[in-house]
Amino acid sequence: MNIKMIAMAVGAAAVLAGCGTVGSDFKAPAGMQEQAFRHAPQGAASEAQLPAQWWTVFSDDTLNRLEHQALRDSPTVKAAAQRLFQAEAQLGLAKASQLPSLTLSTGVSNSRTSANTSQGIALGHRSIHGNNYSVAAGFSYELDLFGRVRRAVESADAQALAASHDRDGVLLLLSSQIATTYWQLRGLDAEMAILRGALATRKETEELVNARFNAGLSNELDTSRARIERANAEADLEEVQRQRNTLEHALAVLVGASPSSMQLEPATATDLPAPPAIPAGVPANLLAHRPDLAASVATLRATNANVGVAEGAFYPSVSLTGNFGYASESLSDISKGGSRVFSFGPLALSLPIFDGGRNQSNLTVAKARYEEAVANHEGKLLTALREVEDALSDVQQRTQQGKVQATSREAATRAYDVARARYERGISTYLDVTDAQRSALAADRAAVQINTQRMLATVSFARALGGGWQAP
């Protein structure tokens, strides 16, 4: 009868455990409204898609190889994966609290009682001695009547989800850093190609000036200027090579390789490929795909659940323990029915009465942390909007700047051709040639630098939207 009553009590408690949960259920913050960005290309919502491996839109095999190498070998990626494993393990610990704890114990002992104690005297001054063998299983279980443990599991689950998004954020940051560094390096390759061409031209010009000087058609000042221009071109080429070496070393570290092992073949083109077009009608609600915002929402959910955990401290805690096993003086008799031992209970209830305000303070802290997380999320959302607008503005303005610079580049090239032709015919001085050379070289390099910035702005746009996205 007692066993039946205990079983009924346990069953009733289990039913009650699913009836209520402390704290309030989490409600995700309102998403972004359907609105277009100020600097986005105008037009209807585009069906164009940026793949999860967003860097493939540049159609550059070397960049693709570097990105995949980084995902495989980068220590940053490995560290982020380990942080995720830790969060998932913490979730496992929290879920374990929802289940009974089972233990198995065995024991053997030899004992002898005194013959001169009251017990021994009652037995006629005899002692009791012998062996004792035992094997038993024990269990303990906290009945989650008010949902405190469920809220703790919810918090751990949200923290694991946040860690997953944080890992995605690390991957996004790393991939964007690689793309940025790579296109900076390719921009320097284009500048080096321009400088090599300029150096060859200056050598030809120096030979022309020397020939005119030897023929008495020029003066020593012109030959000195020619040597200066050639030397300046050589110095500029060495400086750009130095910058390229630095970027190459940085790329090696980003992909998880030794700086000395990275040797990218220089590109020979004097310009960069055109950046991929930004689709028109990019809606702001795509920001929900950003890993930092997704992690922020998961953190909100975790802190909201922690409020429920803190509230649960005000409610009773109910736990049940018990054991079942066998004990015998003889090992051969331990499996017999008469050797069976068991106990159920106590069904223990613990209710906080006075704690000096500890539980109330913990609840206040939990609520404040939730409100802090809400404010942080709002700040991150505004930052995300700004980053997208900045990237779109950069793309737009760099495109316009490139068009204007193309006109300047064409005019500077024409001015140099005219100045050299006039000098060869003796109509103008060599000073006009050097001025035109400098202007043409500066215009060529400026055009490459603007195109490099256009590529970097496209990378920034992809990163600002969270990398992979798909238009609704």
Where are these regions (language model features)?
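Terminal intrinsically disordered/low-complexity segments used for targeting and assembly
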Residues: 2-11, 16-72, 119-120, 133, ...
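Amphipathic alpha-helical coiled-coil/rod segments that serve as protein-protein coupling scaffolds
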Residues: 89, 98, 116-118, 208, ...
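Small/polar-residue-enriched beta-strand and adjacent coil segments characteristic
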Residues: 25, 36, 53, 59-66, ...
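Acidic, glycine-rich loop-and-beta core segments that form the ion-binding/anion-interacting portion
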Residues: 215-315
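Charged, alpha-helical scaffolding/interaction elements associated with membrane systems
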Residues: 73-74, 215, 425
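Sec/Tat-exported extracytoplasmic proteins
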Residues: 62, 74, 88-91, 95-98, ...
